[in-house]
């Protein structure tokens, strides 16, 4: 791991996360970071799998950062994501953004990429996440994300969307929580049925240096 990713790992257990989502984004409500936290919370709630979210955030003047971070944490907790399972890189020494090389390295560790953004003109980050073997969950209401996602075999959810030529509002029946939990189960089933993604996750969680030490070497020494 690079020094930057090691710093993230000192604040959050990256290797032990069964579901690890990385979302690089401006700290603005348009990027809908709270929806990432909510879906991650729902996934953990319906499965009891250790689910963690790392936001590689960089500043934006749209909303006070402390206020928006509190909103995101509150939303995550509401849907089932413990406070310790959510991290902003701006809180650990990267107030102007996490290095791009570090984001790419985190994508190599993660297995889930969620993009509920209001609007996107071209999903470069989606391509970067896909190229590093992440399961993609994209906002179907954003035309650019739908077009790209269809080519990449992404999983779609619907969130509010707004840009030139479209402005949509979503309603969820019976509730937004039920919507996330139902889709969370389906997302996990699809992730489990992807051999390459399953192998990537198992290598990180069960065959890291730490896992080998704790589960294979230390028992031999104690025995």
Question: Which residues are covered by each model-predicted region?
Answer:
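A charged, aromatic-enriched C-terminal amphipathic alpha-helix characteristic of glycosyltransferases
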Residues: 170-221
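Conserved donor-binding/catalytic core segment of Leloir-type glycosyltransferases
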Residues: 13-31, 37-40, 53-57
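Aromatic "clamp/platform" in nucleotide-sugar-dependent glycosyltransferases that forms part
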Residues: 118
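A short alpha->beta transition loop at the rim of the catalytic pocket in nucleotide-sugar-dependent
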Residues: 111, 133-134
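Nucleotide-activated donor-binding/catalytic signature segment of Leloir-type glycosyltransferases, i.e.
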Residues: 66-105
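A short helix/loop element that forms part of the nucleotide-sugar donor recognition site in Leloir-type
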Residues: 1-13
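Short hydrophobic beta-strand element within catalytic cores of glycosyltransferases
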Residues: 135-139, 144-149, 157
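Short alpha-helical segment that forms part of, or immediately flanks, the ligand-binding pocket
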Residues: 104, 122, 127-131, 145-146
